């Protein structure tokens, strides 16, 4: 079975890992980074992903960040490069880039992946993530929750232990807390809670607001009105936040950030950790309630928790760590890298699916209750939150009026008592119900949640056995036709990128060949006659001309490749003549050395060049 990669598709950064030799390993990106910025930009009609996109975010207005915060959002589109894109399409570009460098590392095609999502993602957000994977050319074998993945990474070498684990996961845009029980290789999620709109971006925004307000009061200029200045401010705020994780003060220096009546204006100030803590205190407080709710749902107290695992880059903030320690009464476990644990855990789950990881069972839960709207606008739950998945639940309902010919099934997800206060997942109708008094028809509604947390709903008239089924596709979701079109677009871009890379490689190889041949001719000097050197010199000039002719981006490279092959051939023949000319001399020296009676025999040890890589 082919490799299944594990992808942490994050708000701020993403990561990918694969199982090798029974251990999960992070795959580095082309820039050598172990994580990749979840940033997409467009330049000259072409998309760029990762570090290169993030580096030019300040100067390029067609740059998209934190798209994950809009996954599953009905009707949301972002305009860039003169076109509207859905969150699924932008996320697919990130996934496609990750898939590409994973294939380069593995040396084989990657077609399957386990992708993680925040535990508190609803059905629409999970479906959108799965669609993004499909657009990117990936078969999403499993969607798993980020805290659960982190627990897998933590517990892989502790399968013989019985522990209750609290995972506190504060990422760039989302917050989750999950409580798991680990025993005999079974990772059972007892409860989960969170906030899909709380993360590191919110901490950055607090600093941005503070700096912008301070600058406005001193200079009368609102930096938020200038897109370029605001992006510089965002970068400075994020940098200051990171600095304050290890220092008590961060310097912020942004020269020429704006213009005033008397000339250019500069932002030069400092931010102390104490002030940062003051600015973000409400965010840390906001994260406490989900922890308490998860604990209550699991029927546990803090004294029952054996380990507290921190995950997500934002857990590096000292005030966050202090809050967790104070709340739980335990020193958080720092044995896993908060930026990498989720991808590593996803790779472990990939190994479970392929059978490479034995004796590990993952039992996850649905984060929110599921049900339908009943008479009076009431939300009637069929599946309670924190129910282990996969699961199925049925309940019989009836009509609300005499001779009612059809029933509308309004499917919802949430915890509020009234339907209007919960999230609509979808609607469908069961028609052709035989005329009967109110309350007589028996309509059985069945909810089915698969291993990915994706919901299927059916309604059956038990009298006629007529049935209607739907896989929930929330408002704003993508149709099969839309996904197919986006897949084709993504594939076309992938092919265009491959051609572009081939062109660059061909030109680079030609450059290298020209350089090497010129160097060889220089070394040959007068050791060979002009007639012997002429074929190589002619082929060299022909390649130089072909390179000039193929300078345009859309140029045909056929002639350049042919001229490169010709030069390689004749230059090889020239090198052979040079070698043969030198051989008699070298042979004589060799004979002289073999006659030396003082030759020392050496002991040799065979070295495996791949030994370090196998560790």
Curated annotation (Swiss-Prot):
The keyword Chaperone applies. InterPro entries: ATPase_NBD, Chaperone_DnaK, Heat_shock_70_CS, HSP70_C_sf, HSP70_peptide-bd_sf, Hsp_70_fam. PROSITE patterns: HSP70_1, HSP70_2, HSP70_3. Keywords: ATP-binding, Chaperone, Nucleotide-binding, Phosphoprotein, Stress response. GO terms for molecular function: ATP binding; ATP-dependent protein folding chaperone; unfolded protein binding. Belongs to the heat shock protein 70 family. This is Chaperone protein DnaK. It comes from Leuconostoc mesenteroides subsp. mesenteroides (strain ATCC 8293 / DSM 20343 / BCRC 11652 / CCM 1803 / JCM 6124 / NCDO 523 / NBRC 100496 / NCIMB 8023 / NCTC 12954 / NRRL B-1118 / 37Y).
């Amino acid at each position: 079975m082919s490799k299944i990669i594990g992808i942490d598709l994050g708000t701020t950064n993403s990561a990918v890992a694969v199982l090798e030799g029974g251990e999960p390993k992070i795959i580095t990106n082309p820039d050598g980074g172990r994580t990749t910025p979840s940033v997409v930009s467009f330049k000259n009609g072409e998309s760029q992903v990762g570090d290169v996109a993030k580096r030019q975010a300040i100067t390029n207005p067609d740059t998209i960040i934190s798209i994950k915060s809009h996954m599953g959002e009905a009707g949301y589109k972002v305009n860039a490069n003169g076109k509207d894109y859905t969150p699924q399409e932008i996320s697919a570009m990130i996934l496609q880039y990750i898939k590409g460098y994973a294939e380069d590392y593995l040396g084989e095609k990657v077609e399957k992946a386990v992708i993680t999502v925040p535990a508190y993602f609803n059905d629409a957000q999970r479906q959108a993530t799965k669609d993004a994977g499909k657009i990117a050319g990936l078969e999403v074998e499993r969607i798993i929750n980020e805290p659960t993945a982190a627990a897998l990474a933590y517990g892989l070498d502790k399968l013989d232990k019985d522990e209750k684990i609290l995972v506190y996961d504060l990422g760039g845009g989302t917050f989750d807390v999950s409580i798991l029980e680990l025993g005999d290789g079974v990772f059972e999620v007892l409860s989960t809670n969170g906030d899909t709109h709380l993360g590191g971006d919110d901490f950055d925004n607090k600093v941005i607001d503070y700096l912008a307000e301070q600058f406005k009061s001193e200079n009368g200029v609102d930096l938020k009105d200038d897109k370029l200045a605001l992006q510089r401010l965002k970068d400075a705020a994020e940098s200051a936040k990171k600095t304050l994780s290890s220092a008590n003060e961060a310097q912020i220096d942004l020269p020429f950030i704006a213009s005033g009546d008397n000339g250019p204006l500069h932002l030069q100030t400092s931010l102390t950790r104490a002030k940062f803590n003051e600015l973000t205190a409400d965010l840390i407080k906001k994260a406490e309630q989900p922890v308490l709710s998860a604990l209550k749902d699991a029927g546990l107290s803090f004294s029952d928790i054996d380990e507290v695992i921190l995950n997500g880059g934002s857990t590096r903030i000292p005030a966050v760590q202090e809050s967790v320690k104070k709340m739980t009464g335990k020193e958080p476990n720092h044995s896993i890298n908060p930026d990498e644990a989720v991808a590593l855990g996803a790779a472990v789950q990939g190994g479970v699916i392929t059978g490479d990881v034995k004796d590990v069972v993952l039992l996850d839960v649905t984060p929110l209750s599921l049900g339908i709207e009943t008479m009076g606008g009431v939300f009637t739950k069929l599946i309670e939150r924190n129910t282990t998945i996969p699961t199925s639940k049925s309940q019989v309902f009836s009509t609300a009026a005499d001779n009612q010919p059809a029933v509308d099934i309004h499917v919802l997800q949430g915890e509020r008592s009234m339907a209007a206060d919960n999230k609509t997942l979808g609607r469908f109708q069961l028609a052709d119900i035989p005329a009967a008094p109110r309350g007589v028809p028996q309509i059985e509604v069945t909810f089915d949640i698969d291993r990915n947390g994706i919901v299927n709903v059916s309604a059956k008239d038990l009298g006629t056995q007529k049935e209607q089924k739907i896989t929930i596709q929330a408002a704003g979701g993508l149709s099969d036709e839309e996904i197919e079109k986006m897949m084709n677009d993504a594939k076309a871009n992938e092919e265009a990128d491959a051609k572009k890379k081939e062109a660059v490689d061909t030109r680079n190889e030609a450059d290298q060949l020209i350089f090497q041949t010129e160097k060889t001719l220089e070394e040959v000097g007068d050791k060979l006659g002009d007639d012997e050197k002429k074929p190589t010199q002619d082929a060299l000039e022909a390649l130089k001309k072909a390179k000039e002719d193929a300078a345009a981006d859309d140029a045909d490279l056929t002639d350049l490749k042919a001229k490169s092959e010709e030069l390689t051939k004749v230059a090889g023949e020239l090198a052979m003549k040079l070698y043969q000319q030198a051989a008699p001399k070298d042979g004589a020296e060799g004979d002289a050395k073999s006659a030396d009676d003082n030759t020392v025999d050496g002991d040799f040890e065979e070295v495996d060049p791949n030994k370090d890589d196998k560790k």
